[in-house]
Amino acid sequence: MSSRQTLASWKKLQLLAQDKKSQHMNTLFAQDSERFNKFSIELPNMLLDYSKNLIDTETLDALLALAEETQVCDWRAKMFAGEKINKTEDRAVLHTALRRQSDEAFIIEGENVTEHVKNQLAEMEVFVNKVRQGHWLGYSGKRITDIVNIGVGGSNLGPQMVTEALKHYSDGSVNVHYVSNVDGAQIAEVLRPLEPEKVLFIVSSKTFTTTETMTNARTAINWLTSASFDENSVAKHFVAVTANKENAMSFGIEEQNIFDMWDWVGGRFSLWSAIGLAIALDLGFDKFEELLAGAHDMDQHFINAPLKDNFPAILALISVWNTTFLGSQSQAILPYDQTLHMLTAYLQQAEMESNGKSVSWDGDEIDYATVPSIWGELGINGQHAFYQYLHQSNNVVPADFIGSVKSVTPVKGHHETLMANFFAQTQALMVGVNEEQVRADLKAKGRNAEYIDNVAPHKVHKGNRPTNTILLKCINPRNLGSLIAAYEHKIFVQGIILQICSFDQWGVELGKGLAAEIQTELQTDNISAQHDCSTSSLLKFYQSAK
């Protein structure tokens, strides 16, 4: 048995879960007219309503006791102080230091992190302004018009999600494109309409050895030099973001064109660093600073707010309750704002790569449910795709509904229609409709008894489906920064409670190693006899069918 399961709060939550499974949220709302006020958190720029979950005051108190018994506040202090809480890699976890709004020295292992970050930001600002103002010239002397960000995972998904969410702030000084897939179809499609003499590539890789990224970067260099007929043109068209400056220089990128990363920043938490260069180039450095400021706002709230009023902590506790104690196996992220169309994919990586593990930080096998699988889609699209499953499947899927009060493009009538669906869905998922109501409705519509008997069971919705509602006042850089940081801290709190190291990704590394071996076999046409018969047969079929 895990040490977590011996905690008094854990045992109480197990008992409460058995009791709550027989309750309905409709009853809880009927019994307490103050339920929304008790189970919601309002910040200056956003609101969290978690009242549509199968909880009451006793449950919340037990969840808060669990956070106390698992020392969430102590671990939070350790993270912000720069202690090495990434146990398996012996590293500090300091993505929050990238958005500190202070000049105060922050010394980690003899290095002033504040100074490093401020110097990096200053270098980024100079570079961004030079490119956006047309002073950075390509090999032919023409200004840069297009940026191609080459990366994968955290080096791609975070920046792309943000630039998509905030594209209404872009003034068109440059056009930003992203390449992440090693399938050559993507880079070929991105490069096809571009003019080599006007393109600047950002190669983002912490190690500068990531196979997918380096393959795409080599293709980009070949594309450029075949047009310029000059290998020296690389210096004017390539910059790198990496923690491995030597590898980047060996690749051909000049030292002055290399921006630093640090080992205390994980890839999926790195958009606040120079990994976010594409964001700043697209939106302007001032908007990038607003993004950082919004994340810092949430950092301060996370540090200072009591856990019962703490936006990220409550998100984490509700997720632990729904997954570990009530048994939900997945969670939907459902943005009702077109600008957030990549948010689900971003949060899928952030949460599942962080906490999708089954071994505790002590090395013991975990025998309780940890992170749910994260999935979803833009809300309106989802309504016509998988909401049937959310409403009537025998699997209960908790969902986060995320919307904004003000639309970035206020086309008359559209936002009200969108938000009417937003509010209706959370109510419908909770309230449902019983068979008595269905029969009465069908009878009122003049249906005969035979029809009612046949159809009524199919129209029953049990309801009692848990949801969180997050409402931002608008989608702007500062509010988006706060939202992203809230989910980052949610993931951290989940990891602490579940006794998981949230900042490594060994499952990713295993596949990388095997892929490298198989790639060699495919290139040499020499399939190893060490594979299982399925893999060996697939490789042989692939080779013979080429």
Curated annotation (Swiss-Prot):
Entry-linked PROSITE patterns: P_GLUCOSE_ISOMERASE_1, P_GLUCOSE_ISOMERASE_2, P_GLUCOSE_ISOMERASE_3
Pfam families from the UniProt entry: PGI
EC class (word): isomerase
Metabolic or biological pathway, per its Swiss-Prot or TrEMBL entry: Carbohydrate biosynthesis; gluconeogenesis; Carbohydrate degradation; glycolysis; D-glyceraldehyde 3-phosphate and glycerone phosphate from D-glucose: step 2/4
GO BP term (any one): gluconeogenesis
EC number in record: 5.3.1.9
Subcellular location: Cytoplasm
Active site: E353, H384, K512
The keyword Cytoplasm is annotated on this UniProt entry: yes
Family matches, as CDD domains: SIS_PGI_1, SIS_PGI_2
Gene3D superfamilies found in the cross-reference section: 1.10.1390.10, Glucose-6-phosphate isomerase like protein, domain 1
General function of this protein: Catalyzes the reversible isomerization of glucose-6-phosphate to fructose-6-phosphate.
Name this polypeptide is given: Glucose-6-phosphate isomerase 1
